[in-house]
């Protein structure tokens, strides 16, 4: 990854599975710290609330609040016995993609959709899949791309 200007990131984490959220957040913070980025963290109840929180942050910036160079979405959706998994997985991904495209956001999507706890932990831990770190590095890469393309707002 190329050297980018100092950046400020908003991490939005869903706390539906607290222990897994902690593991994902650890990976994201480690990646951002290694890159010299600063960040704020907000928590929401579940994955479906993450896009709304990002939209609120954008509205807040328009009104003089904190401005963010990029966003990291962290959450875990584990398949259960109902159709709810499909709704949460599909709609959270769709809403994040809509925001990223319509607002030209540098966004790392770390909302994991898995079949069971074993898959979740294998992806959440920094010592294994490190998907929290991956999402943070994706956001940093997209920030660098925005800067290189002159798409900064």
From Swiss-Prot:
InterPro entries according to UniProt = LS, LS/RS, LS/RS_sf
Q: Could you tell me which species this protein originates from?
A: Rhizobium meliloti (strain 1021)
Origin: domain of life:
Bacteria
Mind telling me what this protein is named?
A: 6,7-dimethyl-8-ribityllumazine synthase 1
Keyword annotations of the record: Riboflavin biosynthesis, Transferase
Which residues are recorded as binding (2S)-2-hydroxy-3-oxobutyl phosphate? 81-82, 123
Do the record's keywords include Transferase?
A: yes
* EC number(s) stated in the UniProt entry for this protein: 2.5.1.78
- GO MF terms held by the record: 6,7-dimethyl-8-ribityllumazine synthase activity
Q: Which family does it belong to?
A: Belongs to the DMRL synthase family.
Which Pfam families does the protein's record reference? Answer: DMRL_synthase
Locate the residues binding 5-amino-6-(D-ribitylamino)uracil: 16, 47-49, 76-78, 109
Among the GO biological process terms of this entry, one is: riboflavin biosynthetic process
Pathway-wise, it operates in: Cofactor biosynthesis; riboflavin biosynthesis; riboflavin from 2-hydroxy-3-oxobutyl phosphate and 5-amino-6-(D-ribitylamino)uracil: step 1/2
- Catalytic residues of the enzyme: 84 (proton donor)
Protein task: Catalyzes the formation of 6,7-dimethyl-8-ribityllumazine by condensation of 5-amino-6-(D-ribitylamino)uracil with 3,4-dihydroxy-2-butanone 4-phosphate. This is the penultimate step in the biosynthesis of riboflavin.
GO CC, one annotated term: cytosol
Can you state which reaction this protein catalyses? (2S)-2-hydroxy-3-oxobutyl phosphate + 5-amino-6-(D-ribitylamino)uracil = 6,7-dimethyl-8-(1-D-ribityl)lumazine + phosphate + 2 H2O + H(+)
């Amino acid at each position: 990854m190329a050297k980018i200007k100092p950046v400020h990131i908003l991490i939005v984490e869903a706390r539906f599975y607290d222990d897994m959220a902690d593991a994902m957040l650890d990976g994201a913070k480690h990646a951002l710290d290694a890159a010299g980025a600063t960040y704020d963290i907000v928590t929401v109840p579940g994955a479906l609330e993450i896009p709304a929180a990002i939209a609120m942050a954008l509205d807040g910036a328009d009104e003089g609040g904190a401005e963010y160079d990029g966003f990291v979405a962290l959450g875990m959706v584990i398949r259960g016995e109902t159709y709810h998994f499909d709704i949460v997985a599909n709609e959270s991904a769709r809403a994040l993609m809509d925001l990223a495209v319509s607002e030209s956001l540098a966004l790392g999507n770390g909302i994991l959709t898995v079949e069971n706890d074993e898959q979740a932990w294998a992806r959440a831990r920094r010592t294994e899949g490190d998907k929290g770190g991956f999402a943070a590095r994706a956001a940093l890469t997209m920030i660098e791309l925005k800067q290189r393309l002159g798409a900064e707002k």
